Curated annotation (Swiss-Prot):
Protein name: Putative zinc metalloprotease aq_1964
Enzymatic class: hydrolase
Lineage, uppermost ranks: Bacteria, Pseudomonadati, Aquificota, Aquificia, Aquificales
Coiled coil: none
Keywords of the record: Cell inner membrane, Cell membrane, Hydrolase, Membrane, Metal-binding, Metalloprotease, Protease, Transmembrane, Transmembrane helix, Zinc
Annotated ranges, domain PDZ: 189-265
């Protein structure tokens, strides 16, 4: 499932990107010799008109080969005869279409309707405070309502989540949080959790300990716990929230626990031994909470505006992440390559068509931004070269261009090897 979802995703996104270059080239009457999805030997090849369309064996990218791109040809249909500003627009076509595709997909998703957890759209009323968390250390309590953080108005849990991500990516270490408690407004100084390292504020909405799903083969599944069960006690201790259940399971350190459960008006008890997650080292029993969801639908005009806004927000977050990688605030271990993308694609596809589309739109945006980085071989590097030629009023020396391409190839190969190693290490952890 993951491989098929990955191949479809890569195929669509590469087609979108290369089609942008293709259309821009046609706009300026440049002959396109080859339109390829993938690299290496072709497994499908067909010529229509003056262009050969092909699917190649290695599905990790694609290209359009333009007439006169690699050598100076004195022909009005050749890329080499075009003005620098025209070359810039042809190079810009791919990333531009990635951005437009992202906006279009988001608009269609918002029009069709997005299913989101209901609590994300609700006010930030604290239902649970994690032990030894940032929130507990500064005195946040259940029942507190967070209304503002660092000047950002917080109306919903979604607002709080986005604000914390922005602050973390901006490198803010401490900030002021405003909350309402018993009719009073309090302001607290908090440490901003580092989202890149997986840190959290340590609060959650009130989620009742009602079972929404059971992982197949898990300890809970083996003893017959079912969706709809209400967990009342763990080892004789009453619990009121899902997070208390999680905390008690983790505290068990693998020792047997007893659960008191309400099922269809009857009290039952189950005894089970929590399993240890080899990746995180924490104990679990394989239960998922029952989460209420709402479907958000918007008219197409409103959906389009929301799509543009969401694309802009994600672009800013991505640029901040890139800046964090350069300054060292974000670890390079967070980078993922084809293996990670295949895993994510498979998970999204299993979640449904809409989550898969959202994930595809997000990766399309990443692809567009990545290609605009002014590195040799990438579209951004070509745009930089053409801009320099425009300012100089004459082409750059061929030897410089060759050296520029070699440097770019070395950088891309190094980065590719790095993300592959990262992916493999992530699988082993």
């Amino acid at each position: 499932m993951g491989l098929i979802a990955f191949l479809i995703l890569i195929g669509v996104l590469v087609w979108v990107h290369e089609f942008g270059h293709f259309l821009m080239a046609k706009l300026f009457r440049v002959k396109v010799e080859i339109f390829s999805i993938g690299f290496g030997p072709p497994i499908f090849r067909r010529q229509w008109g003056e262009t050969v369309y092909q699917i190649a064996a290695l599905p990790l990218g694609g290209y359009v080969k333009l007439y006169g791109e690699e050598e100076n040809v004195h022909d009005p249909r050749a890329f080499s005869t075009k003005k620098p500003w025209q070359k810039i627009l042809i190079a810009l076509g791919g990333p531009l279409f990635n951005f437009l595709f992202t906006i279009l997909v988001f608009a269609l998703v918002y029009t069709a309707g997005v299913e989101v957890p209901k609590y994300l759209k609700e006010p930030v009323v604290v239902g649970y405070v994690q032990r030894d968390s940032i929130a507990q250390k500064i005195g946040i309590k259940p029942g507190d309502k967070i209304i503002k953080i660092n000047g950002y108005e917080v109306r919903t849990w979604e607002d709080l989540r986005d604000a914390l991500i922005r602050l973390s990516l901006d490198g803010v270490k401490e900030t002021t949080l405003f909350l309402e408690r018993n009719g009073e407004v309090l302001h607290l100084t908090i440490k901003v959790p580092n989202v890149q390292k997986g840190e959290e504020l340590g609060i959650a909405p009130l989620v009742k300990p009602v079972v929404g799903g059971v992982k197949k083969g898990s300890p809970a599944d083996q003893v017959g716990i079912k969706p709809g069960d209400l967990i009342l006690e763990v080892n004789g201790k009453k619990i009121n929230t899902w997070y208390e259940l999680v905390e008690e399971v983790r505290k068990s350190q693998g020792k047997a626990i007893k659960l008191k459960i309400l099922r269809n008006g009857k009290m039952i008890e189950k005894e089970l031994i929590p399993a240890k997650d080899p990746k995180t080292g924490t104990y679990f029993i394989g239960l998922f909470p029952k989460t209420e969801t709402v479907v958000e639908k918007k008219p197409f005009g409103e959906a389009l505006a929301s799509a543009v806004n969401r694309t802009w927000e994600l672009t800013v977050l991505t640029l901040k992440t890139i800046a964090g990688l350069i300054t060292g605030k974000v670890s390079f271990q967070t980078l993922g390559g084809p293996i990670a993308i295949a895993q994510i694609a498979g998970q999204a596809a299993q979640s449904g068509f809409i989550p898969y589309l959202v994930m595809m739109a997000f990766i399309s945006l990443q692809l567009g931004i990545f290609n605009l980085i002014p590195l040799p071989i990438l579209d951004g590097g070509l745009i930089l070269l053409f801009a320099i030629e425009w300012l100089r009023g004459r082409p750059l020396p061929e030897k410089f261009k060759e050296y520029w391409q070699r440097v770019g190839l070395a950088i891309i190969i190094t980065l590719t090897i790095f993300v592959f190693i990262n992916d493999i290490l992530r699988l082993l952890r």
